[in-house]
């Protein structure tokens, strides 16, 4: 295999074009093989193989800095930069990351995971390069979905102004995770249509030149005038950025030729490359949304694998039903229709649904505008992405106490996506915001109760739930819930475990049937149930949460006890002050000591040794 001979990008420069083409197919096979075992971002990486090979053929990594926005498309990059022997560990605990990571390889120019960051990073690098008198190339590879993000557009504005030498490669596959939305995406599609027209034009030009040179001259002058107008309306020219394209992102020879030419140019240049998401794997080409990030599968007989009924689906089903009951309900999402379980809702209530693209801040402030005019908006968003709209949560929603509901998906440890995606900071940054209430349901039925009640209580409410399966709740059932009140699930005589969110099941498992240990579903963090907390202060208390210990649920409990002048023995279980890498969720919980075994050990340290500990 040719891949066996490739240990660094330098080895690509010694291969013939024919060998590079064969290497592209070998890389695709390896990506399919490993993602079939481990899961991962399959379709994006398959679509970028030729582009990655061309970039490493022309540029000199790691001296030249090649940045991959988000990192979904970087698997080929990992394979040709000295990590092929570890590629089988992709996204596994102790293995290589599914994204680019500075600490993993000198060839990874940035640590990525969130969208739209590459251009600002690249701008910083070219500024540093020029100020330090160094000479290297900076190339930012960004998808058409990520380019719609406000951070990317703001960086383009500054890149055009400063006119520093850098190359932006727009990898246009018409997708992010869901289908792309917005005016810029429509423009990219129009450019692709124009490319088809240009190809037809070339054929007509050859025929016309032979038939009538005079007529050809007239048509050619008209074409030049049209080209001028096209450039005038091209947004990249308006930014002061040279635009080249669109070009075929799977024409390896053509890509190498174009990149060699662009490498010599001064100022900022954008190369528009059109690729096919899932290229070379029929099922991924046919359904790039599902195969964007599939779980494990059989590569010889690839079929969609049911992930079971998830919290995301439970949320989607609940809001779909609620929208039939509440005509003012409106749901927004930042490019996560499928991930947030909103396909059904978007089909049944298209007029009250908005995908704003990868613009979390826009989602939150648009929700504020809706609320100001009498609507009841719900922002469906992952915990890790809500942090990108923190200012809007405070400035646009909370200050005026607007009735916006934040449905926070993927709260807590999320597994194989690692440090950039764990939702373990939202409690800390949200509970400091006045007016904002925070809750976490124990099951899908309680989620339904909280969503319905949240639309009635007034003011902003955050409801957080994990990346996990959950038992389906019956349709049409909307139980009442005592807002702000906790729920005792098991009585105890010596100690109580106060569990918030997903850790409740660990608490019940740890307590078992031991009569000394009680368990509380502490489902409301803000407001805390101070009445119950006062009653429980006669016992030893152990708080448990799938969140950073600092500033989390346990901290809120201690603050409340202090304000009430109560001093029971309290221990807090949560994530320690460090970033957790990728791995299986149960394993990461075990590392953090918030699983059932960790709870039993903490209780034993408090003098309540359970049967498990005594044995």
UniProtKB/Swiss-Prot annotation:
Q: Which residues cross the membrane?
A: none
Identify which cofactors the protein needs according to its UniProt entry. Answer: Mg(2+); thiamine diphosphate
Under the GO molecular function aspect, what terms does this record hold?
1-deoxy-D-xylulose-5-phosphate synthase activity; magnesium ion binding; thiamine pyrophosphate binding
What's the superkingdom here?
Answer: Bacteria
Q: Where does thiamine diphosphate bind?
A: 72, 113-115, 145-146, 173, 281, 360
Please name the GO terms of the biological process aspect recorded for this protein, alphabetically. Answer: 1-deoxy-D-xylulose 5-phosphate biosynthetic process; isopentenyl diphosphate biosynthetic process, methylerythritol 4-phosphate pathway; terpenoid biosynthetic process; thiamine biosynthetic process
Q: Please tell me whether the keyword GTP-binding is annotated for this protein.
A: no
Q: In which pathway does it act?
A: Metabolic intermediate biosynthesis; 1-deoxy-D-xylulose 5-phosphate biosynthesis; 1-deoxy-D-xylulose 5-phosphate from D-glyceraldehyde 3-phosphate and pyruvate: step 1/1
Entry EC no(s): 2.2.1.7
Q: Which GO terms describe its cellular component?
A: cytosol
Q: Which SMART domains does its entry note?
A: Transket_pyr
Family affiliation: Belongs to the transketolase family. DXPS subfamily.
UniProt function note: Catalyzes the acyloin condensation reaction between C atoms 2 and 3 of pyruvate and glyceraldehyde 3-phosphate to yield 1-deoxy-D-xylulose-5-phosphate (DXP).
What name goes with this protein?
Answer: 1-deoxy-D-xylulose-5-phosphate synthase
Q: Which organism was this protein described from? A: Thermus thermophilus (strain ATCC 27634 / DSM 579 / HB8)
């Amino acid at each position: 295999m040719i891949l066996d001979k490739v240990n660094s990008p330098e080895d690509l420069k010694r291969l013939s074009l024919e060998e590079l083409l064969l290497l592209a197919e070998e890389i695709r096979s390896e990506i399919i093989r490993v993602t079939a075992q481990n899961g991962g971002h399959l379709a994006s990486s398959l679509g970028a193989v030729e582009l990655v090979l061309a970039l490493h053929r022309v540029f000199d990594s790691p001296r030249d800095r090649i940045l991959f926005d988000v990192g979904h498309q970087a698997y080929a990059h990992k394979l040709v930069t000295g990590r092929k022997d570890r590629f089988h560990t992709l996204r596994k605990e102790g293995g290589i990351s599914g994204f680019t990571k500075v600490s993993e390889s000198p060839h990874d120019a940035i640590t990525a995971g969130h969208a739209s960051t590459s251009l600002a990073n690249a701008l910083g690098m070219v500024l540093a390069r020029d100020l330090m008198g160094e000479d290297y190339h900076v190339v930012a590879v960004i998808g058409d979905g990520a380019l719609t993000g406000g951070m990317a557009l703001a960086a383009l504005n500054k890149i055009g102004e400063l006119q520093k030498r850098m190359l932006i490669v727009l990898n246009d596959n018409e997708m992010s995770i869901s289908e792309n939305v917005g005016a810029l995406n429509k423009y990219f599609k129009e450019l692709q249509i124009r490319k088809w027209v240009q190809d037809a034009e070339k054929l007509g030009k050859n025929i016309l030149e032979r038939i009538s040179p005079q007529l050809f001259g007239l048509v050619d002058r008209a074409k030049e005038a049209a080209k001028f107008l096209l450039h005038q309306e091209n947004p990249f020219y308006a930014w002061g950025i040279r635009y080249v394209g669109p070009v075929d992102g799977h024409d390896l020879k053509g890509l190498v030729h174009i990149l060699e030419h662009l490498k010599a140019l001064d100022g900022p240049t954008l190369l528009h490359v059109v690729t096919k998401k899932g290229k070379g794997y029929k099922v991924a080409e046919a359904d790039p949304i599902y195969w964007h990030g599939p779980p494990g599968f059989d590569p010889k007989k690839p079929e969609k694998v049911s992930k079971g009924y998830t919290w995301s689906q439970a949320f989607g089903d609940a809001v779909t039903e609620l929208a039939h009951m509440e005509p003012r309900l409106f749901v927004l999402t930042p490019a996560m229709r499928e991930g947030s379980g909103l396909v059904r809702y978007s089909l049944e209530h298209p007029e009250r649904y908005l995908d704003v693209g990868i613009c979390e801040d826009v989602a939150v402030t648009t929700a504020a505008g809706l609320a100001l005019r009498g609507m009841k908006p719900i922002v469906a968003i992952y915990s890790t992405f809500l942090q990108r709209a923190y200012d809007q949560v405070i400035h646009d929603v909370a200050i005026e106490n607007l009735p916006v509901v934040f449905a926070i998906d993927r709260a807590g440890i999320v597994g194989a996506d690692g440090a950039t995606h764990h939702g373990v900071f939202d409690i800390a940054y949200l509970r400091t915001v006045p007016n904002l209430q925070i809750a976490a349901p124990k099951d899908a039925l309680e989620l339904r109760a909280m969503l319905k009640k949240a639309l009635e209580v007034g003011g902003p409410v955050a409801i957080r739930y994990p990346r996990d399966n959950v038992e389906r709740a019956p349709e049409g059932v909307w139980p009442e819930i005592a807002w702000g009140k906790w729920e005792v699930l098991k009585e105890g005589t010596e100690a109580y475990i106060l569990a918030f969110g997903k850790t409740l099941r660990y608490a019940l498992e740890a307590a078992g049937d031991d009569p000394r240990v009680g368990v509380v579903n502490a489902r409301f963090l803000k407001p805390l149930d101070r009445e119950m907390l006062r009653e429980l202060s006669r016992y030893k208390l152990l708080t448990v949460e799938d969140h950073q210990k600092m500033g989390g649920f346990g901290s809120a409990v201690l603050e409340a006890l202090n304000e009430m002048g109560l001093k029971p023995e309290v221990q807090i279980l949560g994530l320690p002050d460090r970033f957790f890498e990728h791995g299986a969720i149960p394993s990461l919980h075990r590392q953090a000591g918030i699983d059932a075994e960790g709870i039993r050990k903490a209780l034993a340290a408090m003098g309540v040794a359970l049967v498990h500990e005594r044995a």
